[in-house]
C-alpha cells in the first residue's frame, strides 16, 4: 500500500514467516467469489515481519509510531460501521521518529486464541486479519492481510441415529431414519424411508439440506434460509411396505460447521428437510436438525499442542424445537 505525502511515499507489506509452507484454504468473499488465504487453527502462533519500502531514498518519512495488530472481528451487515472485536492484540514496532531507509520489523503473536471459524454469510461476516499501521499527523498508512481460521473438532462422544415416524392421519404414514445426528463436512448421510401407509398419490420425494443463518438479538433478529442441496430420493408413486435407501455425500457442497450463538451475535444451523409432493402439487415436509463439524486431517506436525487441546468437543444431542406450518408432516399422526 502506498501513501503519498510531502515528497515521500512508502509501501507496506505484511509477510508471514512460514508463508512458503503454510497451507492455504479457499474462502468465500463478501461478493460471492472464492479466494485463497493462509490457514490457521486455534492456539497457533502468528509471526512474520512488516516490510517498509521507501519510494524516494533521499527523503525521510516522519511518523508517530508503527504497530501491528491481530484482530478477530464480527460485522453485521445491517449494522455496518460497528465492528465487534472478540480478539484484539497489539505489538508496537517502532516509537515516534523518522525512517530514512527501507526496513523490516519482526513481530510474533504467541499461541493466539482463535475461538471461532471464519465465516462469510448473508448478513454477517466473521474475519481474522493482521493490520499494520504507520501513524502520521495527517493520514495513517494502513495495510491489512486477512487469514482464514478453521475450528477442528474431535469425534462426538454421543452420536445417536435419528429415527421418527411421521405422517398425516389415515392418508400417509412413513418412517424415516438417518444413521447419525452429527456429520463431519466430508461425511455421508446414510438412511432409509419406509412407507407404512400410502393413501395419497406421491409423485416426487427429495431431501434438502437447508442452512439457517440467524443474526442479531431481541427485536432485531434476522433469519436467512438457504437451500444448499436437493437430493432426489424417488420419482414415482411408492407403495405400502416399500423401503427407499438414502445415501447423500456432503463433500461436494459448500458447508460450514454448525455455529451456535457465536459471541452472542449469530448462529448457523443445518437441517435435513424431507419433502414429498403429490399429484396435486401439494407439498408435505418434515425438518430435522443435524450438527455439522469439521474433522481434522491427520494431525499436522506443525500444529501446536495448544491448538490440539483447543479442538472443540460436542455436548449431548440437541433436539429441534419445531414450528408447525401447513403441510408439515406430524410426528404424532395428527392432521395438519
From Swiss-Prot:
It is found in: Cytoplasm; Membrane; Early endosome; Late endosome. Coiled coil: none annotated. Gene3D superfamilies: 2.60.40.640. One of its GO terms (biological process) is retrograde transport, endosome to Golgi. Component of the heterotrimeric retromer cargo-selective complex (CSC), also described as vacuolar protein sorting subcomplex (VPS), formed by VPS26 (VPS26A or VPS26B), VPS29 and VPS35. The CSC has a highly elongated structure with VPS26 and VPS29 binding independently at opposite distal ends of VPS35 as central platform. The CSC is believed to associate with variable sorting nexins to form functionally distinct retromer complex variants. PANTHER family: VACUOLAR PROTEIN SORTING 26 RELATED. Acts as a component of the retromer cargo-selective complex (CSC). The CSC is believed to be the core functional component of retromer or respective retromer complex variants acting to prevent missorting of selected transmembrane cargo proteins into the lysosomal degradation pathway. The recruitment of the CSC to the endosomal membrane involves RAB7A and SNX3. The SNX-BAR retromer mediates retrograde transport of cargo proteins from endosomes to the trans-Golgi network (TGN) and is involved in endosome-to-plasma membrane transport for cargo protein recycling. This is Vacuolar protein sorting-associated protein 26B.
